[in-house]
Regions:
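Acidic, polar-rich N-terminal leader regions of halophilic archaeal proteins
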Residues: 1-214
Length: 214
């Protein structure tokens, strides 16, 4: 649950609202209806959807989803699961009353344990989940390229993927490119092009080695 919250929170704050929705959907479907955890994830999923509809200027959809999301979060403690539930409820109620408010203000950032997480704040494995979600969400990205980049990055990290180690090595190699891919929405296409070229070069070397034994 905590991992899904961190992954979805980081994706949402990076502006990838549909990817955040996907991060929460699978654990949400496994929960019993009406439990506190189910209501939290249901509310967050609908907050992401409301924000997406507001971005598309679908005011009626944004209004409906914001009202529903606020209702799901209404019975939860203000800081349930270390999330900024109270602030999100307030934002949702304002969005439900005036969905065009979204044009005048950026979506309220989600916070987990007091921090507005971005992909740069995640462990490598959590970051890899975000990158995978993005590759599945956007047609411009080849999921097999991202999958191989993650595999190569794990090889760079070895057995230690703790956050301090990832932070120290993040600017280099496949690890750095994956962090940039997940964390740089506006320049993501450029980062992906660089990532795909590096992946293809590594694949080519692998094919050359395999050919030695044929």
């Amino acid at each position: 649950m905590q991992g899904a919250l961190r992954i979805g929170t980081a994706a949402f704050n990076a502006g990838d609202h549909r990817a955040a929705h996907e991060a929460w959907e699978e654990p949400w479907l496994a929960l019993e209806s009406g439990t506190a955890d189910e209501r939290l994830l249901h509310g967050l999923i609908q907050y992401a959807a409301a924000t997406h509809h507001a971005r598309l200027r679908n005011w009626s959809g944004a209004r409906r989803l914001a009202a529903s999301a606020a209702a799901y979060l209404s019975a939860l403690d203000d800081g349930y699961r270390e999330m900024n539930v109270a602030a999100v409820r307030t934002h949702l109620r304002r969005l439900a009353a005036d969905p065009e408010f979204a044009e005048r203000r950026r979506p309220l950032s989600l916070q987990h344990d007091g921090a507005a997480l971005t992909p740069a704040d995640l462990s490598f494995e959590q970051l890899a989940s975000v990158a995978t979600l993005l590759a599945e969400e956007y047609e411009a990205f080849d999921a097999t390229v991202v999958d191989d980049a993650i595999r190569y990055a794990r090889g760079e990290l070895g057995d230690d993927d703790s956050p301090p180690e990832v932070t120290a090595t993040r600017s280099r190699g496949f690890v750095g490119m994956l962090f940039d891919f997940a964390d740089t929405r506006d320049g993501r296409a450029v980062v992906y092009d660089r990532l795909s070229r590096h992946v293809e070069r590594r694949r080519s070397r692998e094919r050359d080695v395999d050919g030695l034994f044929e």
